[in-house]
Amino acid sequence: MSMACDDGRVPVPTLTPDESLGLVIHPRNDPTPVVEKLTSWARSHGKHVIADARDHARLPDGVERVSEAELVERAGALISLGGDGTMLGALRLVANRPVPVMGVNLGHLGFLVEVQPQELDAALDRLNTGNFTIEEHSAAVLTDESDELVAFNDIALASVPGEGSVQAVLTVMGRASGRYRCDALVIATPIGSTAYSYAAGGPLVSPMLDAVVISPVAPISGISRPAVISGAEPLALALLEDSGRPALQVDGTIRRRMAPGESLEVRLRPRAGLVVRLDPERHQRRSEVKLSLLDLPFLPEEMRDLLPRREAPALIPAT
């Protein structure tokens, strides 16, 4: 993508003629109506839409099926159709080649997605002309068995029933900083501070801050409070020999089981994700409302039943 200035702030990329729109879809929800709207817009604007060939059975005509590597190489921007989980997958997909990712909400409660399906055409017009802002997101990166793992929400060491608790030593800047014994340890990015870490009692951290939050879940002994650590400080977690064998989770997906004595080194990668924002103030207000719902003893959709019902106004007959 070419780069345009956004009032002297974060440079805003704009699509070049030879770049395609990449599509990332929810693994279960039917995306057909929204994809058809997207391909219709693309035809009328001379744009090409590509998607992972593994989703071929769920893609209508007008979308080129390509390999994951080709999708990453050719996409000038990604359109994520789903909720926050789909959005996280899209961000991870292009973490080594960040391009703007626009989230279209096909889910329920979300903090990353912004665009509603009925707003898609107008949103694509703005994406095409560079009339948007970029919200930069950091990622937590660890190297595991020569494989680099990227998390935009969190990395967690979660105990497995019957396997014993997680027992680990935290090292910051090469110095031991404390010991944990708990059911799970969560290393969260700023955006991930609204997820698993928040449920464990961790603080909310502004996306503008380069920091990680380490939150113990159900601590038994050792450090029992969350800690906020600068993203510039390399940190490591080393499992003690009498620790259980926890599951290593990256953005909620189990990657493998860890063994006592193993250690993980985690670093924060700033500006690893570029999220498209069309109305940052409106999105912030929505996020504040959504965040307040998390502390209520109801599911978001159940809140509608608590609102007073109003009679619909009578239709005024045409004259």
Where do the protein language model's features map onto the residues?
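Short Gly/Thr/Asp-enriched flexible loops that form oxyanion-binding sites at enzyme active sites
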Residues: G89-N96, S197-G201
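ATP/NTP phosphate-donor binding region
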Residues: S2-A77, L81, G89, Q118-T133, ...
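Proline-centered loop/turn at the N-terminus of a beta-strand
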Residues: H48, P98-P100
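Short glycine-rich anion-binding loops that position phosphate/pyrophosphate groups of nucleotides
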Residues: D84-T86, L109, I191-S193
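Catalytic core of DAGKc-family lipid kinases
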Residues: G107-A184
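ATP/nucleoside-binding phosphotransfer catalytic cores, i.e., glycine-rich phosphate-binding loops
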Residues: L149, L157, G162, M173-A176, ...
